[in-house]
Regions:
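N-terminal accessory segment detector
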Residues: 1-115, 120-127, 131-286, 297, ...
Length: 340
């Protein structure tokens, strides 16, 4: 239930790397890319309900409260306050750990919200035929995010206020070293894998683009230095994600034809197991996405990935390699989005 405080956590930078990658991957669609990210929210809510992390409620206000409480208890936001004056709602978020990432994206002219809380909320709003017209936003001197909105029909909803806040002036505290509850990590990772299934053959290629963004994030935020040698680069990624708490140990066996990885006490294992049980072929493991990007930069691409989930959150992955070629087709994804 949403009032349960998790006993296990993972470093936020592990999740931030793929949230940054996801926003960057859809940036070329402009604000329509938010529709893609909101599909991640569908998976987040589905996972939370199936796992009993939140309780489904017929009352929209109660369900929204469940979502907020879940992310508060998982350490993603300290407090969310909503006040109303006539038609106008003022939402104040304190200790919101998306602000550093939002500032980084805004400074690159990317206005997509890959925040798990917002993606889940947007999905909930869409499912209930609700929309928000965003009026204004600001970040206060003490780091709180304040936004004013009003409810409108979905067709009149807006993704941004008329004048988005200038995040270049925000001195946001870095998320490096901060932690998030494991349930929130699992739910978001599940949503990322689930969201793109309808894209068919383009889906894995798009997730590979997310992996490229994850590598960019690690290099810029954690100052990770990746050697030109692909084996050494993969070892460095293994070290970074192990230190972040993705697994206690990540062992690699690399050749020109395959990559084999063994994960010990793998925090992604519950997500992986559920995806495989439900018949999904896509996975969103941060290490695997980043590793695929490193291999692609070295001229290799994966033709097939095989997973085995063992006991005690241990797992094994085998990735067949070939000479890289195809990239994801932006125009094709745009056409698919026209039908969403």
């Amino acid at each position: 239930m949403s009032d349960a405080v998790p006993t296990e956590s993972i470093q936020l930078q592990v999740l931030d790397s793929v949230l940054y990658g996801a926003a960057k991957a859809f940036d070329y669609l402009g604000i329509r890319g938010q529709d893609m990210l909101d599909k991640v929210g569908e998976g987040i809510l589905d996972y939370c309900i199936k796992r009993g992390f939140i309780k489904r409620a017929d009352d929209p206000q109660q369900f929204a409260h469940e979502i907020i409480t879940f992310f508060k208890n998982n350490g993603y936001v300290r407090d969310v306050e909503v006040t109303q004056d006539g038609e106008i709602l003022t939402i104040t978020m304190r200790g919101w750990n998306f602000i550093p990432l939002m500032s980084k994206l805004r400074n690159q002219n990317c206005f997509l919200l890959s925040c798990p809380l917002w993606m889940a909320n947007n999905s909930f709003m869409n499912a209930n035929s609700l929309g928000w017209k965003r009026i204004n936003e600001r970040v206060t001197a003490d780091g709180a995010y304040v936004e004013q909105v009003k409810f409108v029909p979905p067709a009149a909803a807006t993704r941004l206020p008329p004048e988005p806040d200038d995040m270049s002036t925000v001195k946001a505290e870095s998320n490096v070293g901060k932690r998030i509850g494991l349930p929130a990590f699992e739910a978001t990772e599940y949503g990322l894998a689930r969201a793109f299934d309808y894209l068919g053959a383009q889906a894995q290629l798009l997730l590979d683009s997310v992996g490229s963004g994850a590598v960019e994030f690690l290099q810029s935020e954690l100052h990770v230095q990746l050697p030109k040698n692909r084996r050494e680069s993969l070892q460095e990624l293994s070290s970074v994600y192990t230190q972040g708490g993705l697994a206690d140990k990540i062992d690699l066996n690399l050749s020109d034809s395959k990559l084999e990885v063994a994960f010990a006490n793998y925090r992604y294992a519950p997500v992986l197991e559920r995806l495989l049980d439900e018949g999904y072929r896509l996975t969103s493991c941060p290490f695997t996405l980043a590793a695929r990007a490193v291999l692609r930069n070295a001229g290799f691409a994966a033709t097939e990935m095989q997973w085995r989930v063992l006991n005690d959150r241990n797992a094994e992955m085998r990735m067949e390699l070939r000479v890289a070629g195809q990239e994801f087709d932006e125009d094709k994804i745009g056409r698919i989005m026209d039908g969403v």
